[in-house]
Amino acid sequence: MAEVRARVDFKVGAKSNIDAEILSFHGLQSDKEHVAVIFKSADTTQEAPLVRMHSECLTGDVFHSSRCDCGEQLEETITRMGQSGGIILYLRQEGRGIGLYNKIDAYRLQSQGMNTYEANNHLGFGDDLRDFTEAAQMLQALGVKKIRLVTNNPKKIRELQEHGIEIVEVVHTSAHIKDGNENYLKAKVSHGKHQLKL
């Protein structure tokens, strides 16, 4: 059974002005170092807090890559939760679960004309290798059973529900279109069935 290992106050956001806590866990299914960020304005005792499961994306979250919308989705969520509260589960599942180096290999194939899913498949991987079991374990460790989920991805909805988390509302993120990510977003909609208005 997963439990909170440590929790520490810190400030987040583009200007480091949003009060939050970062939590680590032990007892998760794998040895991945997933964390939760709880925004101070969040009341985790409320019936259904706002929750986003965000898979690590070094290229988008840190370097603001033009190839994806991950960094923008994270910033949008931080801003929203800074105002109204919520919980971000930051999951160490780089490249939809294929890892950073394999993702860079997939980028090379995308530069040659493949979409994000075709590139992963060409490298011998499935469309999406992420597993959200540990996200459900993290929520259970926090005593959260009902949530309002921030996502455009039906896989996240389905997997959380399969692990006993009740989703009372799905809140979609905006479409973050920029030069270089149009084909990526189109593939997410057509192939990944993401609920995204382009």
Swiss-Prot record:
It catalyses: GTP + 4 H2O = 2,5-diamino-6-hydroxy-4-(5-phosphoribosylamino)-pyrimidine + formate + 2 phosphate + 3 H(+). GO terms for molecular function: GTP binding; GTP cyclohydrolase II activity; zinc ion binding. Keywords: GTP-binding, Hydrolase, Metal-binding, Nucleotide-binding, Riboflavin biosynthesis, Zinc. GTP binds at R52, M53, H54, S55, E56, Q73, E94, G95, R96, T116, T151, K156. Its cofactor is Zn(2+). Zn(2+) binds at C57, C68, C70. GO terms for biological process: riboflavin biosynthetic process. It is an enzyme of class 3 (hydrolase). Pathway: Cofactor biosynthesis; riboflavin biosynthesis; 5-amino-6-(D-ribitylamino)uracil from GTP: step 1/4. Its EC number is 3.5.4.25. The active site is at D128 (proton acceptor), R130 (nucleophile). GO terms for cellular component: cytosol. Binds 1 zinc ion per subunit. Transmembrane segments: none annotated. Pfam families: GTP_cyclohydro2. Belongs to the GTP cyclohydrolase II family. Catalyzes the conversion of GTP to 2,5-diamino-6-ribosylamino-4(3H)-pyrimidinone 5'-phosphate (DARP), formate and pyrophosphate. NCBIfam families: PRK00393.1. This is GTP cyclohydrolase-2. It comes from Vibrio cholerae serotype O1 (strain ATCC 39315 / El Tor Inaba N16961).
